[in-house]
Amino acid sequence: MNLKAVLTSVLFLSALYAQSQHGEINMAMGLKEVSEHDSSKKYKNVGDFFKKGEFEGHGRYFFMATDNSKGLSDFYANAFGMGIGYSMPRFHGFSVSMSGFFIYDLGSSDLTANDPLTGQRNRYEIGLFDVQNPNNHHDLDRLEDLNINYKYKGLDLKFGKQHINTVFINPQDGRMRPTLVEGLTASFSPGKKLTLYGGLLFGASPRSTVKWFQIGKSVGIYPEGLSADGTPAEYAEQVKSRWLNYAGLEYKPKENIRLFLWNQVFDNVNNTFMFQPEWIIKKRKFEILLASQFIRQQTIGEGGNSEVSLRYAEVGSYVNIFGGRFEFRKSKRWSVQLNYTNIGNTGRFLMPREWGRDPFFTFMPRERNEGYGDMKAINLILALQHKKLPLTARFGAGRYDLPDAKNAALNKYGFPSYYHFISELRFKPKGFIEGLEFFFLMVNKIGFGEDYNNPRFVYNKVDLSNFNLIVQYSF
C-alpha cells in the first residue's frame, strides 16, 4: 500500500472517531454544511480552532453488471471507495472546506475490450472508474472540495471546487462519485417565498473522471456520437468556451404553488431557458401535484468552434421542449406519477452528459434523452414506503419514441425507439447502524424501433438488462 493510501486510511479513522457524535452525512451529495452560528470567540490556540470543525466520511461499494442481447458482450464490475471531508468552524461568516475520495477495482471484466461484433467499447461499468484511463484499477483518487464559503442571513456564497446540484449541472450520482465544478455559486433568500440562484463556473471534474478540466475541455470526455451530417463528432478538446453562468428564481406565492425559472449560458455554445410551474391540490387523505415544463435552447456564438467539423452545436439551431406531470400522493405511503416529454423537431437538445442528467419529467436511470429532437416520451412511476420498516421501492415503465436511428440530424447517438423499465429498492436502517444504506436497481430496455439488423444500434442501447447493488455508509 502506498503512502497516500496509508495517510487516507489514518485520516478516515480519525474522522470516524471525531465524528462519532455527529449525524448522517452523505458524501455522495457533498459536504455537510458547518453550523451557521458565527463563532467569533477566542480560541486557546490554532489546534483548538481546528478541533471545532466538522469531519465527515463516506464509504461505498458498487456492483454493476450488464446483460446484452445474445451474441453481444456482457460486463460486470466491483468498485470500492472511501473519502473524507473537513469543514473549518465558521468565523465571521466564513468557512473553508476540503474533501477527497479514492476508488479501487475489486475485480471486474476487461473494461478495455471492445465488443467483437460491433467494435464498440463498454458503456456502463467503466463509469465506476476512470473513463479516460480504463487500465487504471488501483490509483483512482480525486480532490473534490476545496472552497471558501460565506454566509450572512439569507446569503450563501461559495468559491472554489465544490459539489453542485442545479437543473442542468448536477451530481448524476449513479456511479462511484459525482460531477463537481469550480467557480462561484450563490443563493439568496430575502424571505420565505423567494430564493435567487446564480453561478459563474470555469472548471469541472465530470463523474467517472479523476482530473479537473477547464469548462470547455470538460465536454467530449464521454462518447461524442454523430454530427448532424452523420459523420463522427470531433468536438473533444475543441469546444472553445471560457465560462458558464446560470441564474435562477424559485418563488412560492402560496404554500401549494411553486414557480421555477432558470437560465444557463454556455459561453460561445448555447443558451438554455426553463420555466416550471407546480400546483399542489391538498385534500384530507391525499394530494395531487400538477406540473408543467417548458425549455427553450438555442445556439449562440460559434456553437463551440468556428470550424464546422469541430462544433458541439449547429449554428442557428434551436429547440423547444414541453413536459407535464400528474402525481397522486396517498399520505407518505405511496404515490404514482404520469409524466410526459415532447422535444420539438427543429433541432437537437444538447447538454454535455459529463455535467449531469437531463431535467425532464420522464427521466429514468441508465438512459438520457439528451442529443435528440422530435422525441416523445411517456412514463408511469409508482413509489412505495413500507409501513414499519425503513424500506422504499420504486417501479417505472416508459415508452420513448425517437427519430429513426439513421437520422443523425435528430438522433445524435443512433438510438432506436425503446421501452424502459426500472425496479428500485432502498433500505436505510436506523439505530446503531444508522448511516448504512442498501440500494438495488434493475433496468430493462427493449427496443421497438427499426435497428436495420445492425448490432451497433442495439449494443449497450436496447434489448439489455442492467443490475446494480450499492452498499454505502456515511457519517
For the regions a protein language model found, what residue spans apply to each?
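Outer-membrane beta-barrel "beta-signal"
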Residues: 23, 461-475
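Residues that define the transmembrane beta-barrel architecture of outer-membrane proteins
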Residues: 51, 74-80, 140-144, 151, ...
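Repeated loop/turn-to-beta-strand initiation elements of outer-membrane beta-barrel proteins
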Residues: 54-55, 92-96, 154-158, 193-196, ...
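Residues on the lipid-exposed face of transmembrane beta-strands in outer-membrane beta-barrel proteins
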Residues: 57, 82-88, 146-150, 184-190, ...
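Transmembrane beta-strand segments that form the barrel wall of outer-membrane beta-barrel proteins
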Residues: 59-63, 157-172, 196-198, 247, ...
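Transmembrane beta-strands of outer-membrane beta-barrel pores
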Residues: 61-65, 100-106, 152-154, 161-166, ...
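Outer membrane beta-barrel
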Residues: 87-118, 135-214, 251, 257, ...
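Outer-membrane beta-barrel translocator/channel fold
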Residues: 106-110, 197-244, 286-359, 442-462
